[in-house]
Amino acid sequence: MAEVFNRAYIEPEDYQINTWMTLYKVNTQLTGAMVFDFSVSNMKDNNVTIEIQLVNGENILHYILGPTELQGQGIAWDSSHKIVMMPNDELQVKASAEGVSFYASIVSGLKLPA
C-alpha cells in the first residue's frame, strides 16, 4: 500500500546543461517507491537530448535514453516505466540544452514483500 504520492519536478532555470541532477531520492526511512509517470517538456527553439538514470551510490541500476533530439516549441515526451526504487535510490536526469522541464509522478512508502 502506498503512503505518499509525490510530484517531483525540475524547472528550466534549476538545472545545468549536461549535468546529472537528482529529480527524486528515496528517503532512507521508507521501504521503497515507484515512478509511474515521467514527462519532459522542451519550451525552447532548440532540440535537446534527454537522459534518465536510476542510481544507488555509484551503481547505475537503470538507464533510459530519451528520444534523440526532442524538438523545441513545447514538444513533450511522456513515458511510464514502473520502476521500483529502494531506500537511497536516486532518479537523475540530464539534458543537452536549456529550456527543459522535468516532471515525475511518484508513489513512495511502498510496502515491499520481504
Where are these regions (language model features)?
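Short, surface-exposed beta-strand/strand-loop-strand elements in extracellular ectodomains
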Residues: 45-66
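C-terminal interaction-tip segments
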Residues: 1-33, 37, 43, 95-114
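Hydrophobic beta-strand core residues of beta-sandwich domains
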Residues: 26-28, 69-70, 85
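Short loop/turn positions at the edges of beta-strands in beta-sheet-rich folds
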Residues: 42-46, 85-87
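Short proline/glycine- and polar residue-rich coil/turn motifs
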Residues: 67-75
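Exposed aromatic-hydrophobic patches
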Residues: 74-82
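Noncatalytic modules at the cell exterior or secretory-pathway interfaces
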Residues: 83-97
